[in-house]
């Protein structure tokens, strides 16, 4: 799948409101640019199946090719939601065979303790290069 149109929004959950059905909710994020609302439903990939709670920092990705209502605060359908760990950054990017991000902003160095998993949490046994990767990282050198 091509994720090039996915846009990340990082913020702290201000509120979680149950939706009209059993599998949806509205998550309000407090970001540097103000409040942004996200619809989260059964189609949303929530990494590690984390329970979303008020006060939690998350990165929510939306598809900028999908139509959105022209309202304020902005409202998007969350395609992916990830919760960064302490001092972690998250990046969704296409990486080449040398594990360099397509925008040249990050070069991955896979060590013995690096976990490479599929979206559903299974171990990924192939080389991770030449693919779209959702990367959690904490240390970079420039």
Where on the chain are the PLM-derived regions?
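Residue-level signal for the start and early helices of compact helical domains
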Residues: 4, 29-31, 43
């Amino acid at each position: 799948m091509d994720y090039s149109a996915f846009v990340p929004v990082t913020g702290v959950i201000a509120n979680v409101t149950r939706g009209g059905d059993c599998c949806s909710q509205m998550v309000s994020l407090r970001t540097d640019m103000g409040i942004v609302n996200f619809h989260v439903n059964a189609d949303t990939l929530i990494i590690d199946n984390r329970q979303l709670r008020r006060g939690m920092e998350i990165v929510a990705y939306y598809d900028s090719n999908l139509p959105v209502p022209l309202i304020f605060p902005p409202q998007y359908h969350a395609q992916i939601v990830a919760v960064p760990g302490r001092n972690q950054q998250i990046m969704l990017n296409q990486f080449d065979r040398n594990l360099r991000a397509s925008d040249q902003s990050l070069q991955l160095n896979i060590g013995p303790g690096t976990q490479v998993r599929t979206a559903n949490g299974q171990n990924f046994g192939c080389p991770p290069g030449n693919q779209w990767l959702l990367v959690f990282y904490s240390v970079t050198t420039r």
